[in-house]
Amino acid sequence: MTKIIGIDLGTTNSCVAIMDGSKPRVLENSEGDRTTPSIIAYTDDGETLVGQPAKRQAVTNAKNTFFAIKRLVGRKFSDQETQRDKDIMPFDILESDNGDAWLSVKGQKTAPPQISAEVLKKMKKTAEDYLGETVTEAVVTVPAYFNDAQRQATKDAGRISGLEIKRIINEPTAAAIAYGLDKGKGNSTIAVYDLGGGTFDISIIEIDDVDGEKTFEVLATNGDTHLGGEDFDNRLINYLVDEFKKEQGFDLRKDPLAMQRLKEAAEKAKVELSSAQQTDVNLPYITADATGPKHMNMKVTRAKLESLVEDLVSRSIEPLKVALQDAGLSVSDIDDVILVGGQTRMPMVQKKVADFFGKEPRKDVNPDEAVAIGAAVQGGVLSGEVKDLLLLDVTPLSLGIETMGGVMTSLISKNTTIPTKHSQVFSTAEDNQSAVTIHVLQGERKRAIDNKSLGQFNLDGIQPAPRGTSQIEVTFDIDADGILHVSAKDKNTGREQKITIKASSGLSEAEIEKMVRDAESNSETDRKFEELIQVRNQADHLIHATNKKLKEAGDKVSPEEKTSIEQALKALETAIKGEDKTDIESKANALTMVSAKLEEASQQNSSSNNAEKNDSSDVKADAVDAEFEEVKDKK
């Protein structure tokens, strides 16, 4: 059976792991790193870069280098969070035809799942390079507080990348699996505090051990899908920009190139301040005006950074209280606290969490890798590699429909264990009503308009009757991925209408199919590009070796032969500057043919050198070691 890989598709970094025998293993990418920056760039020559290569060129290609795309997945353009990002991101965020937030990629409107798919493709390739076989299935993690739209968009990204997402699991739950896998027997209740690059989650999880079988049951979850390391970076960036403006009288926000350099420097400074009390942000030639070049050189202390982000850290505490309340527990009931996500390395975050729970968080869980490890273990459960593990996750938000008076009536409450199914009977609101509109909602507010609209559908053909007579049974069915299926049935006629909430990612089936085909054709283009690079490298090596032999041969090669070799060298040097693989191979073969004499000359040189060595060794062979005795003169 093929492997089901585990992928942590993060806002800032992504990570892939597999089950290697009975142990999960995090895989290194082609750059030798265990995590990959979730950065995608589209270059002028049509190449798509992912990870470190994309990050390295971001300064000179800011408009077409995309990061933190996870914050836009499954969101509407009009969302408050989207509007906030729109003003600070160096790339363009646009409104799609159906109102979703899309991006401008080299002037083309592109859906966020299509861009996220490039990161998934990189994870897929990393696993395939290690395993030596094709990978088609994965378990992918999402923030626990992702709504239905965001989950569906993640599944769409998987399809576009060529992966069937067998299961979507929540990031804190995956981290709990990684933590609980090797722990001894006994039951425990843990809190997973997950503050990543763009999202924040808190989950209260009970781990039960019965006769060696571990059950991970999520009791409650809460969070904020727009709070993370990116927000911390932006606070520091804004501070540096404002200080620079005071000193130099120039607003760096007008210079996209400078802002990209500043983003990298701010991220680096934030990381350094987790272990140092002070750091320098030194950016020579950050910009220029009529008076000449401008340089940035500022000192930033840990205390200053903490004062800039204190309210962000405090924002993460309120969901902790709600999650504990929903789980029916108090702080004293929590046995262990697990920190996940790179932003939890900040000492201020660790202190706030420790103060809230009254205990120090565990330090034996890698915050960057735990989620991918948990996803790989769940992949092992689905493929049958891992036994004795049961995962019981929950839906993060209540689900219901709009009823008379614009009220949301919940059918499934938040923190209900999934998969689950629930039905409720409603009646018609008017006399002789022949159709009803089922408006599906997700959220905790009483007014329907204040909740997230997931979609709507009509049930027609209801028999005319006085209001309140016709009975409509509405059924909500949530699968293990947390994705919702809704049906409405007229109990009098048996007429039924069903819907799977799919439109939420903003992509129709036809659009997804087209993107899948585009991705497949791109993978063929990528393969051809790799072959071209390989042939170019071989040709470069041949040119270098031929030049060296030509120099060594000296007058052992006739002037005519030398001229033909030099012409063939020049032809190959010209060919490798082009894109025609066949032409390069042809010119390389021609050079190999005309330089055959060089090979002979090289062998002659080698033979004569060996002969000289043999002559010298013959002299040594005739020599005899003599014993001698020192005779001292008598005094």
Swiss-Prot record:
Short name of any one Pfam family annotated for the protein: HSP70
Modified residues (Phosphothreonine): 199
Biased composition (Low complexity): 601-611
Induction cue: By stress conditions e.g. heat shock.
Stretches for region Disordered: 598-635
GO MF annotations in UniProt: ATP binding; ATP-dependent protein folding chaperone; unfolded protein binding
Keyword Phosphoprotein: yes
PROSITE patterns in UniProt: HSP70_1 (PS00297), HSP70_2 (PS00329), HSP70_3 (PS01036)
Superkingdom to which the source organism belongs: Bacteria
Record field: compositional bias (Basic and acidic residues): 612-635
UniProt keyword annotations, A-Z: ATP-binding, Chaperone, Nucleotide-binding, Phosphoprotein, Stress response
NCBIfam families given in the database record: PRK00290.1, PRK05183.1, prok_dnaK
Similarity field: Belongs to the heat shock protein 70 family.
Protein's job: Acts as a chaperone.
The protein, known as: Chaperone protein DnaK
UniProt source species: Hamiltonella defensa subsp. Acyrthosiphon pisum (strain 5AT)
Gene: dnaK
